[in-house]
Design a protein with these regions (language model features):
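Canonical Radical SAM [4Fe-4S] cluster-binding loop centered on the CxxxCxxC motif
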Residues: 2-35
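Conserved, mostly hydrophobic/aromatic
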Residues: 17, 37, 54, 90, ...
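AMP-binding (ANL) adenylation modules
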Residues: 191-196, 232-233
Length: 303
């Protein structure tokens, strides 16, 4: 759809997580100059784009190579001041050395979605160490608490990996307990598979049996589905600013601030309610919910 766009602010990654081939494929992190990005956003606004998905393999490193410091907060703050930018959404932050000044920018700017996609991968110190993640359970939990303290309404999305070489049942149980505690709004999970040329492929034996990986993946997703269902039910009766993406069958399909295109929940609004404009914002009351979808009715069109 022409009302949202993906804006890549950097290419490559300097981190060397054991399982990941991205640095091998894309090379070192290279930030785009800030003025270039802002010009691109202004150009897209003129073409009718309202929502901007800001993407990079590693957002939080943005600017270090160009300006000698983390500049993601400054970039987002400047982007938010561009007239016509309705929503800015951030994808793929890294927990280690997270720039906490970004939280203030998210909190302060109405048009920066209270949404953060931060891939944590695991919580067991043993697995995090084997993954070369350079962070700990304690640091991860502190960061989640800090994010939620500073931006109470934030939607947190994460990605987890099960079955990494050396993952024991105790490690996995720790991960499940963490998922239950953290109650992530959105989560993707994967079973480890070896990527050629990576540190893990060269140095570790892929020793968690395939069936164990699958059962762990099923288990973590089942726990998460329960959490998402509960969180979605809590939205019933509340009103959310919603962007309309498309018409499908008997429904208009939209998303709230808490939902990124193609990966998160959607809001279904019966088109018997009347014509809605694709790409426009409406205030929508959620009348019912299930694990992956919300069902709503339009209260008013947003300015």
């Amino acid at each position: 759809p022409s009302h949202y766009a993906y804006v890549k602010i950097a290419e490559g990654c300097n981190r060397k997580c054991a399982y990941c081939a991205i640095p091998i494929i894309t090379g070192k992190h290279v930030s785009r100059p800030m003025e270039d990005i802002l010009r691109e956003v202004e150009g897209l606004v003129h073409k009718g784009v309202k929502e901007f998905q800001i993407i990079a393999q590693e957002l939080t490193f943005y600017g270090v190579d160009l300006y000698g410091k983390q500049c993601i907060a400054e970039l987002v703050d400047r982007m938010a001041k561009i007239e016509g930018v309705e929503w800015i959404r951030l994808h793929y932050a890294y927990p280690n050395n997270f720039p906490v000044d970004l939280l203030e920018v998210i909190r302060r700017n109405q048009n920066v979605c209270k949404y953060l996609d931060i891939a944590l991968q695991h919580i067991s110190d043993h697995v995090l160490s084997n993954m070369l993640r350079h962070t700990t359970k304690e640091e991860t939990i502190s960061l989640i608490k800090k994010i939620r303290e500073d931006v109470p309404e934030i939607t947190l999305r994460t990605t987890l990996m099960v079955g990494f070489p050396g993952e024991t049942q105790a490690d996995f149980d720790e991960l499940i307990d963490f998922v239950k505690w953290a109650k992530f709004d959105r989560m993707g999970a994967f079973a480890y598979s070896e990527e050629e040329g990576t540190y893990a492929a060269i140095n570790y034996e892929d020793d968690v049996p395939k069936n164990v990986k699958q059962s762990r993946l099923d288990r973590v997703m089942k726990v998460q589905e329960g959490i998402m269902t509960e969180l979605n039910f809590q939205k019933e009766g509340k009103v959310f600013k919603t962007i309309i993406d498309r018409r499908e069958g008997d429904y208009y399909v939209g998303r709230t601030e808490a939902d990124s295109p193609e990966v998160d929940c959607e809001v279904l609004i019966p088109h018997s309610e009347g014509a809605l404009n694709i790409g426009d914002f409406y205030q929508v009351e959620i009348v019912s919910a299930d694990t992956f979808d919300l069902y709503g009715t339009v209260v008013e069109q947003s300015a």
